[in-house]
Amino acid sequence: MFAFFRRPLFKRARLFLLCAGLFSKCRLKPLFNPLETHCAMKPHTLTLCLLLTAAAVYLCCGIGFGAWESPLAMDETVRQIRLPRIYTALLVGAGLSASGAALQALFENPLADPSLIGTSGGAALGVIVLLALGGGTIGVPTAAFFGALGVCLLILAVHKLLGGGTLGLLVLGFVLSAFSGAVVSMILFLSDDLVLRSATTWLSGSLAEAGFSSPVAAIAVMLPGFLILLSAGRRLDVLMTGEDTASSMGVSVGALRVQTVIGAALMTGAAVSLSGIIGFLGMMIPNVLAQTVGGSRRKLIALSAWLGAVFLMVVDGAARWLTYPVDLPVGIVIALLGGPFFMYLFIKPLKSR
């Protein structure tokens, strides 16, 4: 079957035409003028088509455009390099984006992100401490979960004590991230373990290797977290109207906060154990969907997981192609994209005053 890839480039271009046919049902005009027509595809179906198309292109297109040397070599490349990188990108993108959507509702702040408020840093700290103590890699997702959970609970308590506010949340997240990063750096500096020293690339947000965790272990941690966040979606909508209103409607605010924090910590911890810290992704995807698609928080969490998976896979593939032969960590690229987006979200409310 891989003899197809030995054909010239113009013949391989048929793949792109086939993938483009997936979108034939959907008219893209409503993206620019939604009053004139409508999209025949539901958001979940459209995102699934995007996911399948991106995965097909990622699998079937090489770094370069030369002919493949042998089908067996192509088979090994797909199985040993591209497939692991694809499912790592999908899991990490889904985990960070869904947890970001939930945290934004919990803190009632569109700037909330697993990396910005220190959750990702706490997860990374949990992983490094486990490895430094001689723990096995099978417990990495669990250690990442407890690290993220501890930071989330601390932020929730202090944020409530200070009375909320965007600036207070960001300052608190910055302090916790800096503290976690300092402890991680100290452990890595004092360690002679080769595994710990290899964490430098992992911490930069690289998908070149599946981190210190296996995808199966990460899924086992991430799936319960995703279900927990989905079950909290409708009550998060009520919480965003105000704590007093939510309490009067029978919502246990305290239990909802703990549930959301646990779900977000599970997903963030599993994602960080695979890829290290990737900032801004959990902030960008939910905000883009909230401004374009809208809907309930439950729907936003689900769509954020879908779109986050697609987006991270596409960005990683584009970064590899543009910087070849250097394998640029995708976390660096996401940070370059997310920085201006963060400034836009931060300045926008100030300009409207």
Where are these regions (language model features)?
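Alpha-helical transmembrane segments in inner-membrane proteins
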Residues: 40-353
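Compositionally biased, low-complexity peptide segments typical
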Residues: 27-31
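Positively charged N-terminal leader segments that act as targeting/secretion signals
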Residues: 4-15, 26, 37
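Short, Lys/Arg-enriched N-terminal segments with co-localized hydrophobic residues
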Residues: 32-40
